[in-house]
Structure formats: C-alpha cells, structure tokens
Amino acid sequence: MTDTTRSLRDCLAPAKLNLFLHITGRRPDGYHELQSVFQLLDWGDRLHFTLRDDGKVSRKTDVPGVPEETDLIVRAASLLKAHTGTAAGVDIEIDKRLPMGAGLGGGSSDAATTLLALNRLWKLDLPRATLQSLAVKLGADVPFFVFGKNAFAEGIGEALQAVELPTRWFLVVTPRVHVPTAAIFSEKSLTRDSKPITITDFLAQQDCNTGWPDSFGRNDMQPVVTSKYAEVAKVVGWFYNLTPARMTGSGASVFAAFKSKAEAGAAQAQLPAGWDSAVAESLGEHPLFAFAS
C-alpha cells in the first residue's frame, strides 16, 4: 500500500470465510439470527483513493452490473462525508478480484476498506466504534471488516468477539454461478433453529494439528444451495474426494484448509476446467486496522 498526503493506493479489501454458519432463529423484522466465525484472507479487491478538493465522491472504475449510485463503496464514502461534514472529496478506483455472489464478502469488504481508508485520507480520526455504527447502515457483514479481527459473530453478524485462529492456507473454488443471498434466506427448507453455541464450544473443538476445524459445526445454508445449484454441489463433491470442505456464506464459493501453500497449490492443480480458484493465506488482522483506534 502507498500512503501519501493526497492518495492511498493499493488498499486491500480482504475476503472472508465463514468457518461455520449456524442460523439460530428469525427476528420479527425478518432478519435471521446467526452464529459464525469469520476468517480474514490475504486475498481481495484492491482500492485506490485520491483526494479531491471539490467535495465530490466519484467512482472512476466501471463495475459491471453495479451502478455507481448504488455501489457500497460510493455509499460508504457518502455516508462518512455526511456524518462528519468534511469538505473533502475523493476519487475511488477499484481492481475487482473477488467474484460477486460468492459468499466472500466482497462488496461489504470494499465498503469497510473505504470507511477505514477515508478515515485516514480525510484526517477524520474517528474511533473504530463510530465507523462500526456507520457500517451497520451499509450491510450485515460490513461491521466485521471494520472490526478488523477474526471474530465469533452473533446476531445478524454485528455482535463480534475477536478470536485467535491458527495460520493456514486455503483453496477457495468458485463455480461460475451467482447465488442470491436473499433468495436462499427465503427458502422454506432452510434450517432456522440450530442450537446456539458459545465461543468456547468452537475453540475447544478446533483441530489446530490438521489446520481445519471440520470437527465443528456446518453451514446451514449449504444443503439449500447445493440442492438448487448443481455447480456448487459439484465443487463440494470434488473436494470431498480430496479433503474436507465447506461452503462460505450463501455460496457459491467452497473452501478447504491446508497446512502449507504447496499443499493448497497441489490441490488447485487438480481442479477441472471451468471453476475459478485462489490460494490464499489466513490473516489475523485487517491490513488497514491501524487506520482507526
């Protein structure tokens, strides 16, 4: 990342994985109560921010299917500007590397990186708690990325406790299908009554020797997604012939953990054509964590 008084270049918006995802209930407002552990990855979109003196917020990169006015990046910058009353503006460029509709948190991570980066570039010095309160208005996953640590999440994903996770390498495979989160949450067959657990339940069963917490939990959305999207089911099936794997979020990405980059790369080399993939190392902290106190 390059940091000058006028710009911030090459800011990572890291992907996340849900090491497990349990749906424990549904609130009167329609939102689902969740429990999950979020894992940050050293892989994601790259954002570039350049200061403007005219107060305007402008996205300089076209993102297919995402109009500028509805882009979470622009919404995050505009929200921060409105909250603080700053006269500063910004040009934002994005190198989009994460697939959309994949359960990796790409748009939410972009929004969080925007909040953190502009907190520095605009010299706002807002505390993390304030940025998180703004993040809630942008989406359920955005507060986690502003929180900036691997976390045990509850509620709709906004109640977060930092958790230490072992360093490991992940192979993330994404079939070329878009899974709409809202549609999966509305499915009648979706499990909505998983028994609540505690953070100590997860930590006690983590298998740090193998580097994969497959002894704990599941993704409650996975059976619904694999029943409706054959390509996701194929990826899950391919992985289970090799190593334990799990879908992240509402899909479509499926991941497995490995002890080393070499092991993950060897598995990646066996993938059939037509699936996108990435090998990524776990992160313990968001790269822009220091941009808020």
UniProtKB/Swiss-Prot annotation:
Q: Does the keyword Transferase apply?
A: yes
Which keywords are on file for this protein? ATP-binding, Isoprene biosynthesis, Kinase, Nucleotide-binding, Transferase
Q: What is this protein's function? A: Catalyzes the phosphorylation of the position 2 hydroxy group of 4-diphosphocytidyl-2C-methyl-D-erythritol.
Q: Does the keyword Transcription apply?
A: no
Protein name (record): 4-diphosphocytidyl-2-C-methyl-D-erythritol kinase
* GO MF term list: 4-(cytidine 5'-diphospho)-2-C-methyl-D-erythritol kinase activity; ATP binding
Question: Which SUPFAM superfamilies would you find in this protein's record?
Answer: GHMP Kinase, C-terminal domain, Ribosomal protein S5 domain 2-like
